[in-house]
Regions:
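Nucleotide/phosphate-binding catalytic cleft detector across ATP-hydrolyzing
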Residues: 1-174, 192-194, 203
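Glycine-rich phosphate-binding loop of actin/hexokinase-like ATP-binding domains
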Residues: 171-212
């Protein structure tokens, strides 16, 4: 279960992105040290959530024409997914891939193509991308703290898995995560993530507007 929570105000991160690496490193070290003191335990590895204004989804399709009717194998699906990850992005990187339906032949759609015979397969993917600097800056800060990153988690996906039920994802819903500097919108339908966007608007904007009245 959750052992403890500690947070610290900082002006070195704006809209989910690090812009002062030294201050962020100091802040991270202070937060983790405080948790170690509170829990009376040594923290060796950390799980890091990634979010921010530059995170968004884009669609991409990979098509494979087969020479004859062939039974689809997991190896073929893996190869198609790998081709999807190799697409060229300008100053962006793929943080996560959410496979959509596969189109077999001319019109058959399925999310489980392995074992089905076809002469053509089209893989549709929802790629979650962000600026290259988003993850690299986080990696650099944790390297300077001396703590090892066990895993990078895409925050919107982790949040959805924590708060949405399977029934909600199947029937269709939008999850709106209203933060201080950004608002993240995740749209689900038929148990699949269909769209992800981060809007540069949060509660701090509302607070500033109220204060200016």
């Amino acid at each position: 279960g959750l052992g403890d929570v500690y947070k610290r105000q900082s002006d070195c991160i704006k809209k989910g992105a690090i812009y002062n690496l030294d201050k962020t490193t100091q802040c991270l070290s202070a937060v983790i040290c405080q948790l170690e003191e509170t829990l009376h335990a040594s923290i060796k590895k950390v799980y890091v959530g990634i979010g921010g204004q530059s995170v968004r989804s884009i669609r991409h399709t990979e098509t494979k024409q087969l020479t004859e009717e062939t039974k689809i194998s997991q190896a073929l699906i893996d190869a198609i997914m790998e081709s999807n990850r190799e697409i060229t992005l300008m100053d962006q990187e793929i943080l996560a891939v959410e496979p959509q339906e596969y189109k077999l032949g001319n019109n058959q759609l399925t999310t489980e193509p392995v074992g089905i015979q076809t002469d053509r397969i089209e893989g549709n993917f929802l790629n979650i991308i962000a600026r290259n600097s988003l993850k690299s800056n986080i990696r650099q800060c944790f390297r300077q703290t001396g703590y090892e990153v066990a895993e990078y988690l895409l925050s919107p996906l982790a949040t959805a898995n924590a708060v949405l039920t399977g029934s909600e994802k199947r029937s269709g819903c939008a999850l709106v995560d209203f933060g201080a500097d950004t608002t993240t919108v995740s749209v689900y339908k038929n148990n699949l993530l269909r769209h992800l966007a981060v809007i540069p608007l949060g509660s701090s904007n509302i607070t500033k507007d109220i204060c200016s009245l």
